[in-house]
């Protein structure tokens, strides 16, 4: 489910005074031969993140989300959840994720052909028109083992000259950079992070944060 092992990350930590996503990502790009030539980044920069902060114009047509079909297993699980967790938040009728490898591959194909080219431009955009926009929504599928990062990386390698560089680099950074790096940080520093208070925050959230009445739409 991950491209690097726990030992790989420990070896990385041995050679660094302080773990930083930027140098970890650079190391991974070279290791997996992604957008590099002679160990230098294609396009002259390791990250095009500054290019990936555009607002989403109303004129941009949003891609449709691929349909995930209900299976005999999801039917049974929905009934179980509705009975066992009837007082919990959420609604099983809104379940929209694929639950098989075949469907997950369809979602990957759809992302690569319909979304990836504009993923970078609108990576940080927020819109009331949709909550996914040009993102892949593959994270839960990767985390549950329905599709592997290896498969995704192999497909991305074939698109080197076919999509916008800022989009391709931006998505590669999510898969081999942030995902792998944060896993390594959690495995090696989780106790310190759990017990620590880096920003020395001492104020408590008001009850509105828990009841969904802050007046801030994304939170409520």
Description of each model-found segment:
Residues 54-220:
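Catalytic cores of enzymes that engage adenine nucleotides and/or redox cofactors via long glycine-rich
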Residues 1-97:
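Beta-rich, aromatic/charged-enriched effector core domains that present basic-aromatic interfaces
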